[in-house]
A protein has these predicted regions:
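Conserved ATP/PPi-binding loop(s) of AMP-dependent carboxylate-activating enzymes
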Residues: 390-393, 404-441, 479, 574-576
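Conserved AMP-binding/adenylation subdomain of ANL enzymes
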Residues: 240-257, 264-307, 320-324
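AMP-binding/adenylate-forming catalytic domain of the ANL superfamily
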Residues: 182, 537-562, 575-585
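Conserved beta-loop-beta connector loops within the AMP-binding
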Residues: 397-422, 455-459, 522-528, 563
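Structural core segment of the AMP-binding/adenylate-forming
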Residues: 2-11, 98, 122-197, 311
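Conserved pre-ATP/AMP-binding loop-to-beta segment of ANL
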Residues: 64-66, 180-181, 186-187, 199-221, ...
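AMP-binding/adenylate-forming catalytic core of the ANL superfamily
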Residues: 141-148, 153-159, 301, 308, ...
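Gly/Ser/Thr-rich phosphate-binding loop
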Residues: 196, 305-310, 319-382, 395
Length: 585
């Protein structure tokens, strides 16, 4: 099938892109030059995300510029200037110190898109605590796993979420010393405190300690196909990549109105929902509400958004809604739409151009990379369906594994292989928390192996093929089969469970579970609904399966490992491939 091309014409730019000559910028790029554009801590005391994102603006001429504009579910609009954000994050940093939080201690946030989360993140980085955001849609079990594995010392959450999802777990979380409730005016217990009350007593003056660029700053959990969720560790130096990609990919500049729709529990919601926009001194739109097509069009218009960063799932939901921006909806301020989360189909790219007046630019990266690695840029031609070209400073390639386990780069265009990156960019994860061995397996022959299959065409554009493992991408979430299977087999009826992702046009993949039953149970619709509810209660709606199918037995290897690959092939009617290790063969 002939691939389409969207050509960019410079005459159409009312505001010229920050990156106009891709090849020249790549050739002359250096991370040292990027670092030289930032302040660093006074007196050469290092590099700190909180300082670069807020304090260098709060202490200068832009102090009263709007940093955050929060839109509540019920219509309240609250603005926070850089100066106010600086003072509030100082209060939070002082509060952490008062509560005994030390450098490197993990502070978790479970509260959705509320101003307190953004203030807390910045306060953590200033105080040298480690910020660890979680999806508020998680159920008790995923929360407990991540708090335990992350050695959570303090948790920021709402009173409702605490009572429903955290309080029942407290006996299993001995390392959790304090809980701060963002919406409670009174303390619930000695260790369950009202955040507003505590902040009111804290000083709004704080000096950021000396910060090594390699000091741990962020912990993001990402699911694995086996075992527990992996905690990807990122450091303060990551801000260099957030700054560079904010300029070259998101085309951010001071004074822009910017809206990233991602939840902070997802790495996009932290890297590009907090850090990158504030580094560039924009007004960062924070919408508390979930997806609503009319509301989203209204925000784009009323807030005069210049740059919009969203997800393919949301784009496809807008497409399926059938709604088009009304005649009164003014999108003339919008100059760039970027998308990430799963591959963006060509139809969606072209729909953006037809309905919104701009093509949608796909880009690719992972929790482990910490920032955008491959992208379509505002000034470069788009090949709908392609993830684009590597960022300046990033070397990407296609590699294939040899029989001896080593890897070699594939130079020939159009050959499928694993997408790999040369290590060393600033936002690259530094380890998996408590799992250095697993971290080492991600690297071979000076390549970081992404686990994604792709091809590269003759012009250097990369094209996504599929996952090299069993990770399920659903609505932008990374779901590990093992986590879902583990929850299902806690039900007395379930003997075994195998979980796959089934392609679904709107959300990317739908989580489907295959289960076998214990002897005293029989398949029925009633039991199926019971299991769906059971899993949803434990895992939350973001992770729980949407479909369950009963089987008499699951395909397994002779060693007892469930062959999810075979389950998926049978579900999709695809060739089963090598079944030599299948039990009973």
């Amino acid at each position: 099938m002939e691939r389409q091309l969207i050509r960019k014409v410079s005459d159409e730019w009312t505001v010229p892109p920050q990156l106009t000559d891709y090849q020249s910028v790549c050739k002359n790029f250096s991370w040292q030059q990027i670092e030289a554009e930032l302040d660093g801590l006074p007196d050469g005391r290092g590099m700190n995300i909180g300082h670069e994102a807020v304090d260098r603006h709060a202490n200068g001429p832009a102090a009263e510029s709007t940093a955050l504009r929060w839109l509540s579910k019920d219509g309240i609009c609250a603005d926070f200037s850089y100066a106010e954000l600086g003072r509030q994050s100082n209060r939070f940093a002082n509060l952490l110190t008062q509560l005994g939080v030390n450098k490197g201690d993990r502070v978790f946030a479970l509260c959705g898109r509320l101003p307190s989360l953004y203030i807390a993140a910045l306060g953590c980085w200033k105080q040298l605590a480690v910020f660890c955001p979680l999806f508020s849609a998680f159920g008790p079990e995923p929360i407990q796993q991540r708090l335990s594995r992350g050695d959570a010392k303090l948790l920021l959450t709402t009173e409702k979420l605490y009572r429903k999802k955290v309080a029942p777990l407290r006996t299993r979380l001995p390392q959790l010393k304090h809980v701060l409730l963002v919406d409670s005016e009174e303390d619930l217990a000695d260790e369950v405190l009202s955040l507003p009350k505590a902040l009111a007593r804290a000083s709004d003056e704080f000096q950021i300690p000396a910060t090594d660029p390699e000091d741990m700053a962020i912990l993001h959990f990402t699911s694995g196909t086996t075992g527990m969720p992996k905690g990807a560790v990122h450091v303060h130096q990551a801000l260099l990549h957030h700054y560079a990609s904010g300029r070259y990919v998101l085309d951010l500049r001071p004074g822009d109105i910017y809206w990233c729709t991602a939840d902070p529990g997802w790495v996009t919601g932290t890297s590009y929902g907090i850090i990158a926009p504030l580094l560039h001194r924009v007004t960062n739109i924070i919408d508390e509400a979930e997806f609503d097509s009319e509301r989203w069009y209204r925000i784009l218009s009323q807030q005069q958004v210049n740059v919009w960063y969203t997800a393919p799932t949301a784009i496809r939901m807008l497409m399926r809604s059938g709604l088009r921006p009304r005649q009164a909806t003014d999108l003339s301020h919008l100059r760039l739409i970027q998308s990430v989360g799963e591959p963006l189909n060509p139809e969606a790219v072209l729909w953006g151009q037809d309905v919104l007046g701009l093509p949608i630019h796909d880009n690719w990266w992972q929790t482990e990379t910490g920032g955008i690695m491959i992208a379509n840029y505002r000034a470069t031609d788009i090949r709908p369906g392609s993830m684009g070209q590597p960022l300046p400073g990033i070397e990407a390639g296609i590699v294939q594994q040899r029989e001896d386990g080593s890897v070699e780069e594939v130079e020939k265009p159009g050959v499928e292989g694993e997408l790999a990156l040369r290590p060393g960019w600033p936002s690259m994860f530094r380890t998996y928390l408590h799992d250095e061995e697993r971290y080492r397996t991600c690297f071979k022959k000076n390549w970081y192996l992404s686990g994604d299959l792709a091809t590269r065409d003759a012009d250097g554009y990369f094209w996504f093929v599929g996952r090299a493992d069993d990770i399920i991408k659903t609505s932008g979430h990374m779901v590990g089969p093992f986590e879902v299977e583990s929850a299902l087999i806690e039900h007395p009826a379930v003997a075994e469970a195998g979980v796959i992702g089934r392609p679904e046009p709107t959300i990317g993949e739908l989580v489907k579970a295959f289960v076998t039953l214990n002897p005293d149970f029989e398949p029925s619709d009633q039991l199926r609904f019971e299991l769906l509810g059971f899993a949803r209660k434990r895992l939350g709606s973001a992770v729980a399966p949407k479909e369950i199918e009963f089987l008499s037995q699951l395909p397994k290897t002779r060693s007892g490992k469930i062959m999810r690959r075979l389950l998926k092939a049978r579900e999709l009617g695809q060739p089963e491939g090598d079944v030599s290790t299948l039990e009973g063969v």
